[in-house]
Amino acid sequence: MSRPTETERCIESLIAVFQKYAGKDGHSVTLSKTEFLSFMNTELAAFTKNQKDPGVLDRMMKKLDLNSDGQLDFQEFLNLIGGLAVACHESFVKAAPPQKRF
C-alpha cells in the first residue's frame, strides 16, 4: 500500500482537527459556538489574538453558519479553512518579489 501524498495527509489533518473539537457539546458532526471559539482560540490563536474587535468571532460564526442552525458542519468549517487559505495565498503573492516575464 502506498503512503499518503502530502495533499492526502493535509485532508486527513483537517478532518482530525474538526473531529477533535466537534462533539464536545453534543453533536459529533458539528461545531457548536463554544467548540468553534475553542478551535479558533487554540488552532488559529495568532489570528484571534490580533483581532481588535471582540465581536469578530461571533460574526464569523454567523456568516459561516449557512443553514442558521447555530452549528458548523464540516462543509461550513471547510468554507472557513478555504477562505483563510485564499487570504494567506494572496498575502504570499503580494509579499513575493516580482518575477521577470519573458
Curated annotation (Swiss-Prot):
Binding residue positions for Ca(2+) 1: 28, 30, 35
Residue positions, PTM N6-acetyllysine: 24
Modified residues (Phosphothreonine): 7
Molecular function per GO: calcium ion binding; calcium-dependent protein binding; S100 protein binding
Alphabetized UniProt keyword annotations: Acetylation, Calcium, Cytoplasm, Disulfide bond, Metal-binding, Nucleus, Phosphoprotein, Repeat
PROSITE patterns in alphabetical order: EF_HAND_1, EF_HAND_2, S100_CABP
Modified residues (Phosphoserine): 2
Post-translational modification: Phosphorylation at Thr-7 significantly suppresses homodimerization and promotes association with NCL/nucleolin which induces nuclear translocation.
Residue ranges annotated for the EF-hand domain, each copy included: 12-47, 52-87
Protein name per UniProt: Protein S100-A11
Free-text tissue specificity from the UniProt record: Smooth muscle and non-muscle tissues.
Signal peptide region: none
Protein residues bound to Ca(2+) 2: 65, 67, 69, 71, 76
Primary residence: cytoplasm
Localization annotation: Cytoplasm; Nucleus
Domain of life, per lineage: Eukaryota
Annotated gene: S100A11
Record's miscellaneous remark: Binds two calcium ions per molecule with an affinity similar to that of the S100 proteins.
Subunit structure: Homodimer; disulfide-linked.
A GO cellular-component term linked to this record: cytoplasm
Function: Facilitates the differentiation and the cornification of keratinocytes.
Alphabetical GO biological process terms: regulation of cell population proliferation
